[in-house]
Amino acid sequence: MKKFNILIALLFFTSLVISPLNVKANENIDSVKEKELHKKSELSSTALNNMKHSYADKNPIIGENKSTGDQFLENTLLYKKFFTDLINFEDLLINFNSKEMAQHFKSKNVDVYPIRYSINCYGGEIDRTACTYGGVTPHEGNKLKERKKIPINLWINGVQKEVSLDKVQTDKKNVTVQELDAQARRYLQKDLKLYNNDTLGGKIQRGKIEFDSSDGSKVSYDLFDVKGDFPEKQLRIYSDNKTLSTEHLHIDIYLYEK
């Protein structure tokens, strides 16, 4: 019994010594990453306005059980007569970063959840085609029994803030990062004015979003590492059509006002 008590005491003492060192190491890593983040001031007003428009002013495209064998280029899929509720659009052209990805979904029943753009969009009905990058998942065998709410951990200047569970939801077992990111940035723009200029109440200057799945998969974006001034280039980050398992999935967001 005496040996057992000594062992417990040693384990307790060891945990006291080791734990602070681990925390400090993690804090050092986070501080380095924080310094590497891009600043809002690096972006033009046009870029910020278009990011705001893409994520907050427009609704994402949502389609279920769609199929097409049509293509414009080898790395695209063309869905003719896709839209029934948008007056200005008729066809949908989805771009991928490889022809292999397009072939994988060609003539398959799929669900789509991408953010659209129309400037410099070519391939379908002239002036009546919306373009996207990725946002595609299989329709068969990928549905949850009920919609799942994805928890968000939010830190602003290192202080954790409470976020309600209704901000990001999905009905898929495997979901594209784009579907999650579209909802998360919509929340950040509407509630925290993420892409507003300073004069319009945009206090956030730098930020990072991470999507962390139970299988160890992780995808992260620098929220102000924005390519170009227009959605045609800004949304290209989704052309890889990355997906994550929704089992034990959560989102971590780090925002800084300086």
UniProtKB/Swiss-Prot annotation:
Quaternary organization: Homodimer; zinc-dependent. Interacts with MHC class II molecules composed of alpha/HLA-DRA and beta/HLA-DRB1 chains.
Upper taxonomic lineage: Bacteria, Bacillati, Bacillota, Bacilli, Bacillales
This protein's name: Enterotoxin type D
Stated family: Belongs to the staphylococcal/streptococcal toxin family.
Binding site for Zn(2+): D212, H248, H250, D252
InterPro entries: Enterotoxin, Staph/Strept_toxin_CS, Staph_tox_OB, SuperAg_toxin_C, Superantigen_bac, Toxin_b-grasp_Staph/Strep, Toxin_bac
Subcellular location: Secreted
Species in which this protein is naturally found: Staphylococcus aureus
Keyword annotations of the record: Enterotoxin, Metal-binding, Secreted, Signal, Superantigen, Toxin, Virulence, Zinc
